[in-house]
Amino acid sequence: MSAYIAMKGVITNVDENIRNDEDVAFEYEIQKTPQNILTWKRYIEYWKEEGRTDKQIRWLYERFCSQFVTDTSIWEDYIRWESTKEVVETSRIFWLFQRCLKSCVRDCDRICLSYLELAIEQYDLAMIRHALASSLMKMEREMHRKVWDPVIKFVEEKVLPLTQLDSTQEDEEESTDEAELINVLLVKGFTKGGFISEEISENGSRGDIWSSHILERYLKVAPQQKRNESLATLALTRDNITIKSVYEKYLPQDENSGKYLPSSELPFELNFNYLASLEKLGLDNQYEEFMRQMNGIYPDKWLFLILSLAKYYISRGRLDSCGDLLKKSLQQTLRYSDFDRIYNFYLLFEQECSQFILGKLKENDSKFFNQKDWTEKLQAHMATFESLINLYDIYLNDVALRQDSNLVETWMKRVSLQKSAAEKCNVYSEAILKIDPRKVGTPGSFGRLWCSYGDLYWRSNAISTARELWTQSLKVPYPYIEDLEEIYLNWADRELDKEGVERAFSILEDALHVPTNPEILLEKYKNGHRKIPAQTVLFNSLRIWSKYIDYLEAYCPKDANSSDKIFNKTKMAYNTVIDLRLITPAMAENFALFLQNHYEVMESFQVYEKTIPLFPPEIQYELWIEYLEVATSHQLSSLSPEHIRFLFEKALKNLCSNGIDCKTIFIAYSVFEERISGLISKSIEILRRGAVIGTVSVSTHLESRLQLWRMCISKAESTLGPSVTRELYQECIQILPNSKAVEFVIKFSDFESSIGETIRAREILAYGAKLLPPSRNTELWDSFEIFELKHGDKETYKDMLKMKKVLESNMLIDSASVSHEEGNINFVAAATSHAPNSHTLTQSTSSYSINPDEIELDI
């Protein structure tokens, strides 16, 4: 009946629409078989082909739909035809969709989705809601996702962006920079407080109510994985009433008070959205309680929440609460980045408050402002601003101490930031209470802090207080001995300046008392992993022993002897250091020198004997040099020659076996023998010993050995004659590397020439020529040429040139082993011995095997 009424103005009588026999035939057939859909479709197609009017075709479609009112395919065909007209009547299409959905109960999925799609295309919010409701009612639950997805997409992509573009004061608060934001919040807060009559734009609407209702409905059926995303989208609608009511469905409630609490199951952002809705709705008590709960649940968001709460206080005109919050936060922050953010916001807040109040005071609006009260507020904000700037370093130091209160350097920095002595004392006192000595990382730093604390009183002439402090400091269980060293040494220096040396001695002697079993205590301390106090091993402090000995030596009389108290204390201190194996090379030298200066030379020798074995070979060498120098000094030493020889031999045995270059000792030993016994041969033999030591490795201390060979041969030439000199030359040349032996070959040849042995000299040069290729042996060939020009003739000169040419063409570049080849030509025997004092050396070169190919020249 309703369909008939609706089409009353459209449908005319049959006579107006039936024009020809074909129409009559179709009418007859549909009257005969009205349920034959095919006949109806052919009838409509015929009219469309005939070009009947829209009004006529619509009349026939209405009859068709009335006959098959529950068939959605016919309604779809009708709607499709209406949609293809040149002028589409959207309202008529919506009307058809609604009639169809009202009539049909099954197979409505395509109709529903098409209806919804058209509504979304037309941005018709009312139709979208109707299409959504109809679709959800007609379609199976499993298909609802296909209904919701385009609607939610439309809300997110088309509707909400328009909501965000709506310019309100809320947008202004979110988009401006921080200084402008604070100013906006100040205006808002002062206006709400009734202090100013500033007009602010208030958004009277509830935001995007249409979207919020859609999303509220969607959240009831949304899948779990879409819930959080949808809640976040809901917050964008700014319909705070709906936001609050919907969010509360997902928040837990306090059993006693019934207040809603943050949910740990929801992300932080969603909890904060609820918090923001409470603020927008002016629910201050609920806002502050919820904020307090969020601070407990989200400690990692502490900074963000603090600044949000600060802005909230400003927007409510509660400037004192904001200042207190920021000040408290500065004293709690643990990270420099958080400190920097809060400090800058606090500074900006005080600056903007001062400028804002100053501007209003200049307007002189007595209706709203009490000049006196607000002048005082202005002064308070300006004072806070100035204080923030002045105390920046202190606040920064606070952060460092909160991070690690056991960092002594930070406390010392804090002391330096204080101006008065009283303030410095307070910092020292606080540091001593808060620092755990077992957690101090830098050895000696805590002890230096105690020293500085006491020095503060000492410089103020409060001597007894300083002493009490240092006495107390010695009871602290330091894990590092360096802390006690700092205190004792500093205290001793102060007492030395104030009371004299006896008081300083007493302080250090108290530290250096050696227990009965020091080794056991040292072992326990070493294995204690910083759990055993350093006081147990303080006696092992080299720094304190050094300072103590320095004091003793400085105040020991120059003419002191064994009857002098300080002299005996000095000796005892040195000996204790040796017993504890703390002695250093410098201390050993100083001890020996100290005894020598006080005429106890023999006792100084005992110092060398005891200390030398304590050091590595390199240090032993230096001490042996000093020891032997004093031992061989006839002004100081009374040792017998046999004892001195024993010392030389002992030194050489210990040092040479460890690869130490003992050239200096060999030379000193040689000089000593020549001076004491007058035996030149023995002196030369000592030099030879030094030169041949280490022949297993020809490069060992090579330069020192070369120098010893030069001294040895030079002395032999001048004192022992040709026979011994030849033996030394021969041994030297055979031991040394070829490149170094050439020097001695030339000297050997010159020596033979000087005593008239020219043939031997020529053979020696010929031998040396074979040691190296001519290109690397220029010095020898130059000498060879000079020799032939002076002592040879034309034939010998030619022979020399011929030899050089042969060697240049045949000799291998590497001839390092030529002197050691089997059958190598040895030196020719001398015709006569011209040395009346030709002695055989203690270790003769005859130990070498005789070469059967040795050339003997019968001169």
UniProtKB/Swiss-Prot annotation:
HAT repeats lie at residues 17-49, 52-84, 88-108, 123-157, 177-219, 238-271, 427-459, 461-482, 520-554, 599-633, 639-675, 685-718, 720-754, 756-790. Pfam families: HAT_Syf1_CNRKL1_C, HAT_Syf1_CNRKL1_N, HAT_Syf1_M. GO terms for cellular component: cytosol; nucleus; post-mRNA release spliceosomal complex; Prp19 complex; U2-type catalytic step 1 spliceosome; U2-type catalytic step 2 spliceosome; U2-type post-mRNA release spliceosomal complex; U2-type prespliceosome. It is found in: Nucleus. SUPFAM superfamilies: TPR-like (SSF48452). It comes from the Eukaryota. Keywords: mRNA processing, mRNA splicing, Nucleus, Repeat, Spliceosome. The keyword Flavoprotein does not apply. One of its GO terms (biological process) is mRNA splicing, via spliceosome. Belongs to the crooked-neck family. Involved in pre-mRNA splicing and cell cycle control. As a component of the NTC complex (or PRP19-associated complex), associates to the spliceosome to mediate conformational rearrangement or to stabilize the structure of the spliceosome after U4 snRNA dissociation, which leads to spliceosome maturation. Belongs to the NTC complex (or PRP19-associated complex), composed of at least CEF1, CLF1, ISY1, NTC20, SNT309, SYF1, SYF2, and PRP19. Present with 2170 molecules/cell in log phase SD medium. This is Pre-mRNA-splicing factor SYF1. It comes from Saccharomyces cerevisiae (strain ATCC 204508 / S288c).
